[in-house]
Regions:
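A conserved segment at the C-terminal end of the G1
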Residues: 167-179
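Conserved glycine(s) of the Walker
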Residues: 163-165
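A noncatalytic interaction/capping subdomain that flanks phosphate/NTP-handling catalytic cores
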Residues: 1-158, 175-176, 188-348
Length: 348
């Protein structure tokens, strides 16, 4: 098995896997990482493919938690469910308490479990939830934002989906001289922002496309939205296809938290309580570790793994973020204006 290393957030988060494509929220770098680079990460998640037939036998006498199997204090959790005929869906979680988290799934789970359906979550969702929990356990918080730095100021741009946060950062970087940090997701300790630059939701914007075919596809998506769900070769360009490596920053001290709203109103300063409420709401919409069946079942057998404590830590870190930055509400009916409005607001 050819295991490869990927660092998705420098010195913070990495993943080891043999899969060619990692379908999780933190993205996938264009290049693999060395052992030295992956070992510098505070958190390394491992994803492995195996039949898990031997593990199924080991858990035959374990306690049941719906389709999950575990034992009190055991740093392992097993999932098994009938698929069709004699085939099974299987997943094994282990290493959470030891700080070496690993998810092992069989090929059926990888192939047939897509998205979130009731309590059945894809491996990408499971990996994202696990990574979020591991980050929070180390006083770090995933942040659903885009981010850029310009003239000594570093901005986290937070907004509901499809409002314009990605477009704002990409316009600021490509047209207004800003340095890139993240376009959809980052990590924060409440003071600094750590880049997760390998997501690629910016590929859906016409002006950033690099081929006539891709531009045509983007226009069709606006007319027929379900086309977005159909994969297209060449639609996964990474950020360094658009921006030079030296203009991609990995860590900066945050100075501004900006929340976007698609409505008239211009720019105004938010009070800290209102800003925190909005940031928490938007972060909770994106990250669902609190509702993860896998983590919930694991915490049943390992109550010291307290999901509610992780939620409080998220609130504490984001409260620190709001207290440490100037918080702005930027409002416009035209999302292409957001970047200029943000920069003007930051300079005042």
């Amino acid at each position: 098995m050819n295991i490869k290393n990927y660092v998705v957030c420098d010195n913070i988060l990495g993943i080891r896997t043999a899969l060619k494509k990692i379908d999780w929220s933190f993205g996938q770098p264009s290049k693999t990482a060395s052992e030295e680079e992956i070992n510098q990460c505070r958190i390394v998640v491992r994803l492995t493919i195996d039949s898990l037939k031997d593990e199924a036998k080991k858990f035959e006498n374990s306690q049941k938690y719906h389709y999950w199997l575990g034992d009190s204090g055991r740093d392992e959790l097993f999932y098994q469910r009938n698929l069709f005929a004699s085939s099974k869906l299987r997943l094994l979680l282990r290493g959470v308490k030891s700080g070496q988290p690993e998810i092992i799934i069989n090929k059926n789970y990888l192939r047939f479990v897509i998205g979130r359906f009731i309590n059945l979550h894809s491996i990408g969702c499971q990996l994202t939830d696990l990574a979020c929990a591991m980050l929070l356990s180390r006083e770090l918080c995933p942040l659903h934002c885009s981010s850029f730095s310009i003239d000594g100021s570093t901005v986290a741009v937070i907004a509901p989906g499809n409002t314009g946060k990605t477009l704002s950062t990409m316009r600021a970087v490509l047209h207004l001289g800003a340095f890139f940090i993240s376009e959809d997701l980052a990590v924060t300790d409440g003071e600094n922002i750590y880049a997760c630059p390998w997501t690629s939701t910016f590929r859906y914007y016409d002006e950033l496309s690099m081929s006539r075919l891709l531009r045509m596809r983007m226009k069709l998506i606006k007319i027929i939205p379900p086309l977005e769900l159909i994969p297209m070769h060449g639609g996964d360009r990474k950020i360094n296809a658009y921006i030079e490596d030296e203009r991609i920053l990995s860590k900066e001290k945050l100075t501004h938290t900006v929340i976007l709203a698609r409505r008239p109103g211009g720019v105004k300063v938010l009070d800290k309580e209102q800003a925190l409420s909005m940031v928490l709401n938007l972060n909770r919409y994106e990250f669902m570790y609190m509702k993860s069946p896998m983590l919930t079942a694991y915490s049943y057998f390992n109550p010291e793994f307290d999901i509610f404590a992780l939620e409080e830590r998220e609130r504490s870190i984001l409260s620190k973020l709001v207290d440490n930055t100037t918080c702005l509400l930027v409002q416009s009916d035209d999302p292409t204006r957001f970047a200029d409005m943000i920069i003007d607001g930051v300079k005042k």
